[in-house]
Amino acid sequence: IGLGIPAEPLFRSNYLLRLQQVFMRCEKLQRHVKFLYSKGGMYKIYNGNLLYHGCVPLNPDGSFKQVEICGKEYSGKALYDILEYYARRGYYAKDAKERALGQDMIWYIWAGPGSPVFGKAKMATFERYFLEDKETHIEEKNSYYKLLENEEVIGSILEEFGLDKADAHIVNGHVPVEQIHGESPIKCGGKLLIIDGGFSKAYQKKTGIAGYTLVCNSRGMRLVAHEPFESTEAAILKESDIFSDSIVVENFSRRKMVADTDTGKEIQENIFYLEELLEAYREGTIMEEV
């Protein structure tokens, strides 16, 4: 591109527009995004456990941090809910302005200082690439990460999301665990479990592992730590495999039954409505089609 050509800005604008259209019209990408919106969320409560990515923004004293979103302040669960609302408007809204606001909020969720998903004061990617001064590379983390062993704080987070702090767990993703230096993914006596811990290859020199998998069955919960995968070539030539170590998190005092799970509750609810329907037919409240 000639830097002295007057038409260059228009050329670049058209180029960016075409690039945008390629992304928006990509069938596979749209299918993936649709899947994320239909199955995903800012957090999930599953079988009495709280799953989220990043952190719950906290003040240094452990109280929930107030974050301003569109002129109003939110904290704790309400912050997650309002951010998810806007993220969904960014995809589903018919009004162009409303959809644009939602898309701006998705950007904020990714890199905003008050975002639970980001959890830092700033993103210093630019500084790390282009500035030699290491001081500019620092990304100050939210106070949450210093309070992972605080039982009162972890209990208040579980209660904020409507869970029993005596039995529930927090399953926390996107937190590197430096196992190479003896750090454990099990925090606060087993109330908080980290399941990322180095899954990304970029973190593996720092963590010494390739992440964790949480396994939960009728008898208990355990974390499986995975060794980094070297390469396909090494796996063939050396006949090596990915080795994993298990860490027992909790053994249940009694075995969990299907009825104790969210799936079991859904089955029980379906049984209830089917029995109600059957009773209505038997009593003649609903007439059979002949």
Language-model features: locations:
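Feature recognizes metal-dependent phosphohydrolase scaffolds
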Residues: 1-290
